[in-house]
Each structure stands twice: as C-alpha cells, then as structure tokens.
Amino acid sequence: MPIQPLKKELVSFLEPYMPENAGVLGEQEKPYVILTYAQSLDARIAKIKGTRTIISHQETNTMTHYLRYKFDGIMLGCGTVLVDDPGLNCKWWPDDEPKPEHFAEHSPRPIILDPNGKWKFEGSKMKTLFDSGDGKAPIVVVKKLPEVVEENVDYLVMQTNFTGKVDWHDLFIQLKSQFGLKSIMVEGGGIVINDLLQRPHLIDALVITVGATFLGSEGVEVSPLIEINLKDISWWKGTRDSVLCSRLVSHS
C-alpha cells in the first residue's frame, strides 16, 4: 500500500536527531543509535501480548519510512518479528528524485535479535522483499550458529548472560565493525525497548509516537524499572498522533 506524502515540517522537526547531524559517526566506536516506537497514551505498544496492534496514524507511519531512509540498520527482537512478520524496508524517497524501481537501495539492513534461533528468513515477508529487490537480507544475532545456515543471511554470534540477553555495548560495536553500520534505529519490541531505556549511554536519541488511544491494562507496557530523565525535548503534533524527540540523561 502506498504511503502518504511526508509532512515537510516533520523533516525539520526530526533533523537535529538524525545521524548526519551527530558529527561523530566516523569517530565513535559504536553506531549512532535511536530508539523509536509507537505507544498508546497509557504507554502500551500492543493491546495483548503476541498480537499486532496498529497505533500510528498514516502520516507518522510515513515518518517511520523516512527514518528508515536515514539509517543503515533497523533492529527488532525475534518475538516482535514472529508476531508481525515485518518487511522492515523503506518506501519513502526524496521528492527531487525519481521513484526507484526497487526499494532495497534506500532500505536499512534488518537486524533480528534471535539468540535461540526461533525465526526463519525463508517464508518471511523480509525474504519476499529481498527476492523482489525491495529489501535487504538480515543480520541475525544468535548465541550459536544454527544447524542449517540460511542463504543470504549473515549471522552474528554473541554470548548471552544468565538471563539470555546479549551485552548491548558489545553488540553495537560488532554491528559497526563487522557490517559497517554507522547508524541503527531500534524499533522494538517491549523487552528490547525497556532494556535499552535503562542504558541511556548507548542511546543517542528517542523518537516516540504517541497515539490518541488507550490500550488497557492487559496491553504490553513500556516502562523501565528505573527512573529515566530526558533532555533536548521537542514535540510535534499531527492529525491524530504526537511525536516526542529527545535525548536521555545519562546516569551520574
């Protein structure tokens, strides 16, 4: 389905938080990382665990594709990928350029966090888009290589701790050094978002879409275990959604 035209004021609103304005992409050890997701007014990202919930208005959905145009990589946890079967490609292109025949060139590289090897590239929407030239093949983060290595997939083997999670700092460094990803947008899901919110030193910016809806107490909540403060805060108000851009205050 075609996306709506991008609101021009969104471009200037997002500009200070984009990787090209960081000024350190070639210098710092890790990539430029933003955390971006859509939530309800009661801080839910899904109505019920294990189900897909559309929160964003079409104009902020276009904003998501604009962000994908700006970033080298896009990261999701395998739980969200198994539920949503996302394409993770980019359908936006600049007005002063002709419509591309295929969208792979403008799309970020998918990064799937799948330590236990639950997700398969074959049969996914990502594979369909890759085959048609409209998306890139993924990097799959695992704790050990699968018995059957899928064609066109790059595997990044990372050790996990006793809770089954990877070391985020090491992961970001490896994604830059091994795959040349200088900027990464992290889209979810809930476990990933909550975990990274507690590590403000790793997150360069937040871009949060707040939809005009309540999803209820059974929804999947975004709420870190500790207090998190923000700085450099900006708000944009759309037809139905509002968008918050900010940076996180590092722990003292």
From Swiss-Prot:
The keyword Transport does not apply. One of its GO terms (biological process) is riboflavin biosynthetic process. It catalyses: 2,5-diamino-6-(1-D-ribitylamino)pyrimidin-4(3H)-one 5'-phosphate + NADP(+) = 2,5-diamino-6-(1-D-ribosylamino)pyrimidin-4(3H)-one 5'-phosphate + NADPH + H(+); 2,5-diamino-6-(1-D-ribitylamino)pyrimidin-4(3H)-one 5'-phosphate + NAD(+) = 2,5-diamino-6-(1-D-ribosylamino)pyrimidin-4(3H)-one 5'-phosphate + NADH + H(+). Pathway: Cofactor biosynthesis; riboflavin biosynthesis. NADP(+) binds at residues 80, 84, 166, 189-193. Belongs to the HTP reductase family. PANTHER family: 2,5-DIAMINO-6-RIBOSYLAMINO-4(3H)-PYRIMIDINONE 5'-PHOSPHATE REDUCTASE, DIHYDROFOLATE REDUCTASE FAMILY PROTEIN (AFU_ORTHOLOGUE AFUA_8G06820). This is 2,5-diamino-6-ribosylamino-4(3H)-pyrimidinone 5'-phosphate reductase. It comes from Kluyveromyces lactis (strain ATCC 8585 / CBS 2359 / DSM 70799 / NBRC 1267 / NRRL Y-1140 / WM37). The lineage of its organism: Eukaryota, Fungi, Dikarya, Ascomycota, Saccharomycotina.
